[in-house]
Amino acid sequence: MASAPPSESPGSDTVEQQDTAAGENVDPSVKLAELRGQAGVVMTINQVQRDSGGFVTVQAEIKNGGDQPANPAQWAGSESVIVRENLASVGGATLVDKVGKKRYYVLRDTDGRCLCTTKIRPLQPGDSTAVFMQFPAPPNTTTEVDFSVPTFATTSLKISG
């Protein structure tokens, strides 16, 4: 499990660690898709992997190419449980299987916490952060899904594995 280095919160003596557990190592130079967001923010998809446990994990990097700080709170979506438990996260992401006519939401644990990157700090201009989102896997016959995160464009992704 990989995680981002701890960072100090401004005006605080505590060190807060961003949760970026993402499973296996991901090659950041692999660019499967690029989603444009608001104000110059770009999400680059590095891996979309189906595993034997019945999950699909999407791993990506979000970079602020704009000139203002990017607020990650919008990426959590508007579902009340996700927002309450995972405000600074990518918990609002979805996969859509157009053939099977089904939408898949980011998985959650029994406390409502998403199986995704949480505690994302506002991205300053030029900053980037690695993120992951884990979903229930669509049927093995589904090899392509539409992927969306609030404020980003939707894109089609091929599932490997």
Report residues per predicted region.
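N-terminal edge beta-strand
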Residues: 26-27, 36-47, 111-114
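Immunoglobulin-like IPT/TIG beta-sandwich domains and homologous Ig-like subdomains
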Residues: 46, 51-52, 122-126
